[in-house]
């Protein structure tokens, strides 16, 4: 079924409707960030996007953004996949929270490494900005829609990963949001 993510077939099956809706939401978010319609809490244009995930939620998107960096937009991509606190801290030191979007990518939204990193980033963000502004700066990609809301992410900023999408194929769908934003 993962081939449905790459298909240009416009039949009206349930799967293709789900794929079309997800791709449409990705395009909207990407376009809004790149054209300045979606801004940070302070009204400043987004300059950085950070993908927080491991395995298929990280490797494919990082590979594609690196491979196609020649075609990059003005938004700079970062990837947090390592649980080492120094690794995450070094990335955060180089970012302005006012101009950064964070994408938490976890199919179940229970992946320990991803959630630990997301909690570190959230704590840093709240310390430097405030909790209310999470809604402007955090996006979740998951098939679990409830836990991201508890994290503070608004429904409109939650993109689904269908259960039938395996990790290595996930970059063709919502896991590839950072690709859509940056390339």
List where the protein language model places each region.
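Extended, charge-enriched "interface" segments that sit outside catalytic cores
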Residues: 1-42
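Glycine-rich phosphate-binding loops that contact phosphosugars or nucleotide phosphates
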Residues: 28-36, 43-183
């Amino acid at each position: 079924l993962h081939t449905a993510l790459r298909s240009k077939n416009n039949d009206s099956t349930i799967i293709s409707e789900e794929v079309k809706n997800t791709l449409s939401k990705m395009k909207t978010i990407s376009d809004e960030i790149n054209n300045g319609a979606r801004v940070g809490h302070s009204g400043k244009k987004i300059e950085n996007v950070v993908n927080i995930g491991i395995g298929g939620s990280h490797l494919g998107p990082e590979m594609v953004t690196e491979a196609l960096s020649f075609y990059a937009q003005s938004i700079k991509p970062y990837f947090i996949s390592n649980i080492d606190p120094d690794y995450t801290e070094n990335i955060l030191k180089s970012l302005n929270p006012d101009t950064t979007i964070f994408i938490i990518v976890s199919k179940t939204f229970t992946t320990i490494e991803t959630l630990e990193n997301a909690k570190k980033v959230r704590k840093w963000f709240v310390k430097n900005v405030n909790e209310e502004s999470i809604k402007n700066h955090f996006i979740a990609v998951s098939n679990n829609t409830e836990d991201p809301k508890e994290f503070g992410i608004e429904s409109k900023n939650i993109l689904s990963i269908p259960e039938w999408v395996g990790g290595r194929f996930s970059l063709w769908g919502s896991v590839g949001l950072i690709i859509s934003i940056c390339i």
